[in-house]
Amino acid sequence: MSSSAHDHPELGPPQLIEVADRVFGYIQPDGTWYINNTGFIVGDRSVISIDACSTERRTRAYLDRIASVTPAPVTTLVNTHHHGDHTYGNCVFGDITIIGQERCRAEIIATGLLGNTGIWEPVDWGELTLAPPTVTFTDRLRLWSGDLPVDLRYVGQPAHTSNDTLVWLPEQQVLFCGDLLFNGGTPFLLMGSVTGAIEVLTTVVAPIPAAAIVSGHGAVCGPDLIGTVVGYLRFVLEIARRGLAAGVPPLDAARDTELGEYAGWLDSERIVGNLHRAYCDLEPSRGKPDLFAALSDMVAYNGGRPLSCRA
């Protein structure tokens, strides 16, 4: 196995940023498919990690960086949601307490490990086994890192997924928000809700007095990113309304759309999956979107090529 964090040196090494005293963000470039951010909180005798990485190799590199900061063991792992880029590496942590919202555990078990499906470029996942949360909560849970409170909060409704959890450090004013925010990348709502994400960001996330936000992908940011992401989601809803009125499917609506200010965001093909979800949000009688059909449409939008994945 390569000792590097990844097999794509052009991406550059992950950045370790101390966003507050004893609180670190681990930022993996370039934040595209399956290249996520994690973070950790250093206590006197133990460490709390927020999320794992997508591959064995990346997760081991992350654990090495934690060990470079403190000899204290990682005893607790919090999953912000069930997606594999944040949870596949759970098993690499060994026998520790894994915490997630109750639907996070259920979705991890139901979804399993992805493998190489042809939707994305092939990935060397490493030796992985499914490791869902061993402790679950419904709405809120408070952890302690020494004398530092760490508050877990389910956002209350589907947004990025059905089980998004905020990790808020009130004394440090640091928020880990998982994939509710992407910084420089296109948000992805196929397994959540576009309308729900707008409501969560505006009524749950925005009121939190965060001085620093570690998003699920991209650079550490401030609260200004919330409005930027909400603007994109409202743009998606407007395209969906037009598509439904014209009777065109999501792929055609996406192909007819000029992305404008969002064209430079990474993974722009997500507009297709987002429209599949937005159609269902606006017309609930459609039920849930067909995930494989939506992902296949994203490949079609990408010129028939598998989606770029350099995890």
Q: Which functions belong to the PLM regions below?
A:
Residues 2-23, 149:
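N-terminal amphipathic/basic leader segments beginning at the initiator methionine
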Residues 15-65, 165-178:
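Conserved beta-strand hairpin/beta-sheet module of binuclear metal-dependent hydrolase folds
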Residues 17-19, 41, 140-145, 215:
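Short acidic-hydrophobic surface loop/beta-edge motif
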Residues 19-24, 121-125, 146-152:
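Short Pro/Gly-enriched beta-strand edge/turn motifs at strand-loop
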Residues 22, 41, 51, 66, ...:
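Divalent metal-coordination and catalytic microenvironments
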Residues 46-48, 52-56, 142, 149, ...:
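Metallo-beta-lactamase
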Residues 57-60, 64-145, 162:
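Active-site HxH/HxHxD metal-binding segment of metal-dependent hydrolases
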Residues 248-311:
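C-terminal regulatory/interaction regions
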